[in-house]
C-alpha cells in the first residue's frame, strides 16, 4: 500500500473532523453509521457532514460498506495515515514526506524531514497486510484470537509498544534510534546513516563487533527484555563512528520484545544468539571457540572465556524495563493487548524453525549451518541479489520479491479476503 499525501493539503478542518469521527466510531462499530458520524463530529448541519463524507470517500480515506443493513462507513488505511500525519504535522514532528526507504515484514519505511529540514525515518505499521511467511498463517492466528480483524487497532498498539521500547532503551543508553514521535500506527525516529548488517562482508575488527553484539543481547536481558528478532536484518552498521567508544551499530525493530520472565524466554534468548553466530560463521568466517584458559568473562569470542552467551549462566537482572513497558510475559495484559500479542507471536515465529536451534556445538555440527529465512526490515533496491546456499532460502527470497513487487505496484488488482487481507495468487 503506497502512502499518497497529494490530497492532504486540500482537506478542510471539517473534513478532518468527520474523518476523526469515523475513527472514533470504529472503536465500537465495524461500520460506523452516518448519523453517529454526524453526532461525533459535532458538525452543525447534516448536509455539511454528508459533503465531507462524500469528499473523503472519493479520496478513499473512508469506504462505504456494501450489504449492510444501514448506511455507514469505515476508516481505510489511507484515512488513518492522514490522521496520523496531520497530528505529527501539528506537533512539528514531520513537515515533508520523501521517498520510500523500503518495505518491511509488517511495515512501510519512509524518509521524512521536520520543519528545519532534519532527516528522519517514519515507520508505518501495517499488521495483517500480507504475511511474508504465508497468508494462511495470518488467518490462523486471527481465528485463534477471536478478537476480530481490527488490524488498524493492532497496528496502533504495535507502534505504541515499539515507541515505548525505543524511548525506554534510548534513555538507558542502548544503541537504538532516537524516537521522536508516535501517533496511531506511525513511529518517527532517527535516521541512521548506514546499512543493514546483512550486507557486511568486511570489518576492521570482527571479533570486537561479535563481542559487542553478544553483550548487547546480555545487557538487554539484564534489563529485563529479549529482542526476539535480533539478526543481521535488524542491525544497522553505521557509516561513521561518533567516537572511539562507539560500537558502530544500531539495533532496530522492537514490537516483538518480551520479558525475561516469559515462559519461552530461554528459547528466544538462545535464538537471538544463534542468529548472530550463524551470520558470523557463514558470511564472515568467524566461529570462536570457548577457551577455559581465559579468565575474562566481560565479553564473548576470541580472548574471552566463553564463545557465546547462555541465558541461565549470563543473565542477571539489573533493571526492570520489562515491568515499566509491560512487556509480554511480565504480567497479565489488559484485554485490549491480547490481540496484539497473538499477532506479534505469529510474527516472532513466522520464519523460524525450531530445528535450526544450535543449543551446543554438537547440535550445530549435526544440523549444519542453518538457513537464513528472516526477512529484511529495510528492502533496499541497491542490495545485490546474492546467490543463496540453500534451496529453502531461495524460495523464501523469491516469495519476498513477489510480495514487494505487488505492494510497490499498487494493490488495486489484488483480491482481498473477508477480513481485509490482500491475497497473492
Curated annotation (Swiss-Prot):
Catalytic activity reported: L-seryl-[protein] + ATP = O-phospho-L-seryl-[protein] + ADP + H(+); L-threonyl-[protein] + ATP = O-phospho-L-threonyl-[protein] + ADP + H(+)
Keywords from the UniProt entry: ATP-binding, Cytoplasm, Kinase, Magnesium, Metal-binding, Nucleotide-binding, Nucleus, Phosphoprotein, Ribosome biogenesis, Serine/threonine-protein kinase, Transferase
Enzyme Commission no: 2.7.11.1
Subcellular location: Cytoplasm; Nucleus
SUPFAM superfamilies the record matches: Protein kinase-like (PK-like), Winged helix' DNA-binding domain
UniProt main location, coarse: cytoplasm
Transmembrane helix listed as a keyword: no
Catalytic residues identified in the record: 229 (proton acceptor)
Stored InterPro entries: Kinase-like_dom_sf (IPR011009), Rio2 (IPR030484), RIO2_wHTH_N (IPR015285), RIO_dom (IPR018934), RIO_kinase (IPR000687), WH-like_DNA-bd_sf (IPR036388), WH_DNA-bd_sf (IPR036390)
Domain of life: Eukaryota
GO biological process, one term: maturation of SSU-rRNA
GO molecular function terms attached to this record: ATP binding; metal ion binding; protein kinase activity; protein serine kinase activity; protein serine/threonine kinase activity
Biased composition range(s): Acidic residues: 354-400
Region described as Disordered: spans on this chain: 350-420
Family: Belongs to the protein kinase superfamily. RIO-type Ser/Thr kinase family.
Name of the protein in question: Serine/threonine-protein kinase RIO2
Gene source species: Saccharomyces cerevisiae (strain ATCC 204508 / S288c)
Highest classification ranks of the organism: Eukaryota, Fungi, Dikarya, Ascomycota, Saccharomycotina
Gene that this polypeptide is encoded by: RIO2
